[in-house]
Amino acid sequence: MSVNYASLRFEYERAPDHDAPASSPYPVAIVGAGPVGLATSIDLAQQGVRTVLLDNDDTVSTGSRAICFAKRTLEIFDRLGCGDRMIEKGVSWNVGKVFLQEDLVYTFNLLPETGHSRPAFINLQQYYVEGFLAERAMQLEPLQMRWKSNVIGVTQHEDHVELQVETPDGVYPLKAQYVVAADGSRSAMRKLLGLDSHGRTFKDRFLIADVKMKAPFPTERWFWFDPPFHRNQSVLLHRQPDNVWRIDFQLGWDADPVAEKQPERVIPRVKALLGEDAEFELEWVSVYTFSCLRMDDFRHGRVIFAGDCAHGVSPFGARGANSGVQDADNLAWKLKLVVNGDAPHTLLDTYASEREYAADENILNSTRATDFITPKSAVSRLFRDATLNLAKDCAFARRMANSGRLSVPAVLRDSTLNTPDKEGDVFNCAMLPGAPCVDAPVRVDDRDAWLLPQTHGGAFTGIYFCGLGHGPEVCARSLAGLSNESLPVRALIVVPRGMMCTVPGVTVVEDVEGMVAHRFDARPGTFYLLRPDQHVCARWRAFDAASVTAALKRATCNG
């Protein structure tokens, strides 16, 4: 049966806590069933953590929400069990073009090299993303999804948080060891705790028009500065599934947000871009302003903030939803270890410090893009236009031209969870401690596969690079003790092309194109330790069990 995800609704059910409050707190309650709350709840449930997901509505998001989902987000969705659905429905793209007036200034490719399983970006309406995530969540038994459940009270205690949850059947109390607030930019959780975000609001207005049409434009991101069809402003064009195109028109601060949403104002703007004879339908129209801001602290006792309620950015660069999903990715494994008693609660402080750093990076990039796109003085405008004119011929100017630095994952190089490289161990690659693991083509069990899915499962992973001089069986004996750690480490052995074999209890992958060794700057004996969120936390030129144990303790605040 075909599902209309744009109008998807979920059934409200009376919560058992109405009649008999749980005898002990739930391990985790999550407030907000957008992409961030859904991703966090799925991640926890896949690891066996009993979780309650609360949302004050019974629908998915509609209208002009997020549409650009980055490669790293897609890799996280793969781990959550719904990446393929996103790719199949979404519009994949790697290439963008920047124009000044009628002239092409430059073209960029966000994924110029081969050997990656996912594209740089897909465009996919947020209601599809939420729908696919919700359907995945409903498959997981440890997860309860409670719709039309509005949190109206929060009380923190020494060992739990008590929420007052308002439903069509009245109000009931819900206790949880930890609460994740993922209820968006207008967060009720933030207000209930008397907290706020701080930052900068930009004095400009933008019109978003989601237009249904058949158009000859390629599947690329096109951005115009001062185009002839919309003088002295900017325009962004993106393709979405179902023959829908997202068009963003800069309007200026003095534009009337109510009047500009009217069809008689929107249609002429769209026709100026497409041509007077163009046939199209307006699917959604909105006018927005935006801010770059964040909370001072993402953790407040047993309440942890993630996504838009913790930080907000302008839409230039697609850093909002993508950074929120990365919040979920960072938080879930830490919550699991803490509620299971395998790590102290101080591990959750590293969620705050790492993701506050990432938020600052996103806000900086978003602010710079906005300042370039919307110059606030004649001098700034002259600088911008001169930069764009130079960018046609000069590579250095292209690095300065900024139509939105598109989302990339944060490299947590200063994280306290990282183990510094051993003195004398020299690496020449991007896989430094704190970096997210990069993908590469491999073969597993005599079939084509990818590296990243071999690191799924919610555990730490040790990647050992085996040479031709000693077989995987010898390597496996060296790694045998890892499974006996207090937190077991899953061993993964990478062998050169043509050396594939089977070792009981160990995943052996064949580096068929040599890309794994190249991207990790690996030699025989090189060993990498990955966190459950696939970030590198340590690496060595030679495996040493005691060093791995120490790094594991450091990465879980057990040192």
Task: List PLM regions with ranges.
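Helical substrate-recognition/capping region of FAD-dependent monooxygenase/halogenase enzymes
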Residues: 1-31, 46-47, 100-103, 131, ...
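Conserved FAD-binding catalytic core of PHBH/FMO-like flavoproteins
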Residues: 88, 104, 134-135, 160, ...
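FAD/FMN-dependent oxidoreductases across multiple families
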Residues: 10, 241-243, 257-323, 343, ...
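Active-site-adjacent segment of FAD-dependent monooxygenases/related oxidoreductases
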Residues: 62-138
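Core beta-strand elements of the Rossmann-like FAD/NAD(P) dinucleotide-binding domain
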Residues: 24, 169-178
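A conserved short coil-to-beta-strand element within the FAD-binding core of flavoproteins
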Residues: 147-161
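Glycine-rich Rossmann-fold phosphate-binding loop(s) that bind the pyrophosphate
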Residues: 33-34, 126
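Glycine-rich FAD pyrophosphate-binding loop
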Residues: 45-65
